Design a protein with these regions (language model features):
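Solvent-exposed, charged interface segments at domain starts and junctions
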Residues: 15, 102-133
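Solvent-exposed helix/loop surface patches that form functional interfaces
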Residues: 120-192
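Solvent-exposed, flexible loop/coil residues
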Residues: 5, 62-63, 144, 149, ...
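Acidic, serine/threonine-rich low-complexity disordered tracts
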Residues: 26-115, 163-248
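Bacterial N-terminal signal peptides that target proteins for export
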Residues: 2-15
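C-terminal motif of bacterial Sec signal peptides marking the signal peptidase cleavage site
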Residues: 21-24
């Protein structure tokens, strides 16, 4: 699931990190949240209709913006994930937004719902504050996407994430983000010229999440591939592709 990451999930990421995600990636492995709307492309993007877009932007956090994704996970099976911006308010230096995520897996009786709060700063950086899943709240410290100016194509950028979860438990992860550069991508929603970002999330326990995310200007995340590695062996994987995007 995204973060919707965030990651996506975890974010992907991170949230940063979401797809494989809010459920904790099963079997006690670290959750991956892929943050939707990670930094967009550095050059002109191409919409599904082939129209060049203006200079790239970070996540289009407008009230009512809605993304629908097809999810195919080796752990959870196939499903559909809907992500919607449900609240936006101005704050010092940017805006604070709330994102509602609903993941419905094939054969499940009810969807898995969770929310993410983040701040979209004027410089293009995004900072995640918390994620709420099934009544449980996970808070973050130093969890953010750097501003576009801070990402240099081909040069990895590393940061540290601290998460506080149930019963005050704290975990630390090291996140490396690399802007690979322009990349063409085709998903059910259309064909796009995107920016490909690669993330590596390493937990203190030794597990590692490898995340590839294709970002399109004005839309955000259109495709995410996540692989969870435990003890140097692939443990789980997921692919998330955009089927539709509706502006609020």
């Amino acid at each position: 699931m995204p973060a919707r990451h965030l990651a996506l999930g975890r974010l992907a990421a991170l949230a940063g990190l979401f797809c494989l995600a809010a459920a904790g990636c099963a079997a006690g492995t670290p959750a991956v949240v892929t943050a939707h709307g990670q930094p967009g492309p550095r050059g002109p993007a191409v919409t599904g209709a082939g129209t060049p877009a203006a200079a790239w932007t970070v996540m289009p956090a407008q009230l009512g913006d809605t993304w629908v994704y097809a999810v195919d996970s080796s752990v959870f099976g196939k499903g559909t994930e809907t992500v919607r911006i449900t609240a936006v308010k101005p704050v010092a230096g940017g805006q604070r937004a709330t994102m509602a995520v609903s993941l419905r897996l094939a054969g499940s009786k009810a969807p898995l719902n969770f929310t993410v709060q983040f701040t979209d700063a004027a410089d293009g950086s995004i900072t995640f504050a918390s994620t709420s899943v099934m009544g449980a709240r996970l808070t973050f410290s130093s969890v953010s996407w750097p501003s576009p100016a801070a990402l240099t194509p081909g040069r990895p950028r590393t940061s540290t994430i601290t998460q506080t979860g149930l019963l005050g438990s704290r975990t630390t992860e090291h996140v490396t983000i690399t802007d690979i550069g322009p990349a063409a991508v085709t998903v059910p929603a259309g064909s796009y010229q995107a920016t490909l970002l690669e993330q590596t999330v390493t937990a203190s326990a030794g597990s590692r999440n490898a995340i590839k995310t294709w970002i399109v200007n004005g839309i955000g995340q259109v495709k995410t591939e996540t692989t969870v590695v435990v003890e140097c062996k692939p443990f789980a994987s997921s692919v998330q592709t955009l089927t539709s995007f509706t502006k609020g």
